Amino acid sequence: MPGKIKKNLFGYNEEMGFTKEELKEMSLSCPSLLCTDVQRKVVPQFEVLHNEAKIPHDVLAKFPSSLLAPWVPTRSRLRFLQSLGRDQFDPKLANYVSPELLTVKSDEIFCEKAARCSPVLFDDYQRTL
């Protein structure tokens, strides 16, 4: 196993706390996770998704590509959802927002499906930051 992949697996397992089973699931559905710089790209996004949004490991393992999204827009969207009272990331409860929706590339899709508001409202919110 090449050194970079081995180092990345260590980061996912030891630093972020993913189990070997979760890592296998994540690697099969999003192989680019193994080649991405964990410290620079994944850890900051993990901090937002897991530590700030309180999204558990098992949910993140089902949406591994969300770990590759840029962390700054994700944090902004999270805070926007919190301001609206729509920051619900438990799949067992109503009004669930998946990590995939939180990190979708399009602000329009995020606003329509996750925040349930107009993109204009989100743009106005971002100008206040």
Residue positions per predicted region:
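Long amphipathic alpha-helical repeat/alpha-solenoid cores
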Residues: M1-L129
